[in-house]
Design a protein with these regions (language model features):
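Hydrophobic beta-strand positions that form the internal "hydrophobic ladder"
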Residues: 9-11, 71, 111-112
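Residue-level detector of beta-strand face positions
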Residues: 29, 84, 150-152
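A flexible loop/linker signature enriched in serine peptidases of the S9 family
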Residues: 1, 13-29, 33, 40-59, ...
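Beta-propeller fold detector
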Residues: 38-45, 92-96, 129-137
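Short loop/turn segments that connect beta-strands within beta-propeller blades
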Residues: 32-36, 86-90, 127-128
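Serine-hydrolase catalytic core recognition
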Residues: 103-110, 114-201
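Repeated scaffold domains used in trafficking and secretory/extracellular systems
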Residues: 2-4, 61-63, 100-106
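Residue-level detector of Asp-centered blade-edge/turn motifs that repeat once per structural unit
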Residues: 6-8, 66-68, 106-108
Length: 201
């Protein structure tokens, strides 16, 4: 499994050896335009793009883009997807916070990101993380939106990470019905994003 991005002085290849089937994440390699030599560029081993589950996405866009010889890309780590960059063989965060960056564009130092942040359906944000659209304000006005509280459970030597979404009117110490939802995907993660199905329950 491989994909590529055109850099100024080299072709950047994101490739996985398939050792763990579809669960194998990629590393970065570069192909020099002059010599055609392929060399390792950065060991990464994390997912490219977002795999944060959600049911309110509308379309999509690019998950990676070259600017000169710098790669900007979305990557899922643990329970969220943020924007990172690969420069001179090193990966560093650009804009990472709770939620999911779903797609973005970058030009002349400016960015526009489509993200699921702050328990809202997709909105557009600039390179500082400032929200620039208000597509969903009217839909959410006057509605209760449960905030996902992280929950970690340990069974033997294995830790399970999850969230609790408390119902409207929840009172500590008072019993209430519970819906227990386990995702079965090998790559999908639940994260702190607006998920209509879970809010509806």
């Amino acid at each position: 499994i491989a994909t590529y991005a055109l850099g100024k002085s080299f072709l950047l290849v994101m490739a996985a050896d398939g050792k763990f089937g579809m669960n194998t994440d990629c590393d970065f390699y570069k192909l020099d335009y002059k010599t055609l030599a392929v060399t390792p560029y950065a060991v990464y081993g994390e997912a490219i793009g977002t795999s944060v589950g959600c049911d309110v996405r509308h379309g999509g866009g690019q998950a990676f883009k070259m600017d000169g010889d710098v790669l900007y890309f979305i990557s899922t780590r643990f329970d969220g997807a943020g924007l990172y960059k690969l420069e001179d063989g090193a990966v560093s965060p650009v804009l990472v916070r709770d939620g999911s960056v779903d797609c973005f564009d970058h030009k002349n130092g400016k960015m526009l990101l489509c993200a699921l942040w702050d328990m809202k359906p997709q909105e557009l944000y600039d390179e500082t993380g400032r929200r620039v659209t208000h597509f969903n304000d009217a839909m959410l006005r006057g509605k209760y939106v449960a905030q996902p509280d992280p929950l970690n459970l340990t069974a033997g030597d294995h830790e399970v990470h999850g969230f609790i979404l408390k119902p409207m009117g929840f009172e500590a110490g008072k019993k209430c019905p519970v819906i227990f939802d386990i995702h079965g995907g090998p790559k999908t993660v639940y994260g702190p994003v607006f998920y209509h199905e879970m809010q509806y329950w």
